[in-house]
Amino acid sequence: MQTRAPWSLPEATLAYFPNARFVSSDRDLGAGAAPGIAASRSTACQTWGGITVADPGSGPTGFGHVPVLAQRCFELLTPALTRYYPDGSQAVLLDATIGAGGHAERFLEGLPGLRLIGLDRDPTALDVARSRLVRFADRLTLVHTRYDCLGAALAESGYAAVGSVDGILFDLGVSSMQLDRAERGFAYATDAPLDMRMDPTTPLTAADIVNTYDEAALADILRRYGEERFARRIAAGIVRRRAKTPFTSTAELVALLYQAIPAPARRVGGHPAKRTFQALRIAVNDELESLRTAVPAALDALAIGGRIAVLAYQSLEDRIVKRVFAEAVASATPAGLPVELPGHEPRFRSLTHGAERASVAEIERNPRSTPVRLRALQRVEHRAQSQQWATEKGDS
């Protein structure tokens, strides 16, 4: 059952509650916002969980999911996927966050010979993707796992963890499907169990963190993962409140947050719960640590000439991707030497100039793309590798 907030809210905050006007916002920080209808869209759209997607049934497959920058991702990765055959035959694409299957569908439709391996930690998402992509079943493998376990997933699918994949795609952050289901506890505008697990089979919930972590640990989570400037006040309030009765629902936590954050701060910057909910979700799902492991593993999994694209929706994720990518395109030759040492050349080259953003047209079509940052790399061949290959070929 959906319930309204039990208090009077200022105009700036009302935008995040049921029946309020639509407000475009950061995908993650606005993730708990209430459903509403996006005004004056040129395509049939509906807002679910604060994210605008196509009306269910309005698309050709009726799955109501509009993938972000799908065409641009296709353009960036296709050269690596068509280097054997124009239809993608013999190429392998790893979709590390398959979700509802929107990006995967674009690749499988556009490249009728392509093999795709899709990963997701959410079994519900895998069920949706399986239904959406059923016509490609002979070229599709789905694996229930986190993306930091992609090496094991590749092995399970019959591929090596190193140098076996031609393309890799990450679409990071919470999914609209997870937000749509109130019982998952991701949204702060409806009352639901304080859960927030992307994978319901894992043990740790948001309620466990809120009710058992000490004050210092809570403040650290809110500060690091939510960049919440009132982290200490909120943590202290949580500890005082739970001493009387444990937190069990999102509404109870939202009420505490509204009391803990000073009134002037509540009037600006959106809903007072948004940063705390983001922080708890990241902590519950170990999102940033998983990403720190997954991106280097993905780079290792790429074959020479292979390409990777990552879509990030908030600064914490993008910083990790940016740092790993910067290291990948850097030379290993010691600074100060006048020439590049053989075998010390960069392993990768950048395919994007910094982070690409969605165009005005893309944002108008799909407001969910507003905060996205897209980065892409290609694995390149060292001269030493090329010479070794030529020598081996001559010896054979």
From Swiss-Prot:
Protein name: Ribosomal RNA small subunit methyltransferase H
Principal subcellular localisation of the protein: cytoplasm
GO molecular function: rRNA (cytosine-N4-)-methyltransferase activity
EC number: 2.1.1.199
Lineage: Bacteria, Bacillati, Actinomycetota, Actinomycetes, Mycobacteriales
Organism: Mycobacterium tuberculosis (strain ATCC 25618 / H37Rv)
Function: Specifically methylates the N4 position of cytidine in position 1402 (C1402) of 16S rRNA.
PANTHER family in alphabetical order: 12S RRNA N4-METHYLCYTIDINE METHYLTRANSFERASE, S-ADENOSYL-METHYLTRANSFERASE MRAW
Cell location: Cytoplasm
Note: Was identified as a high-confidence drug target.
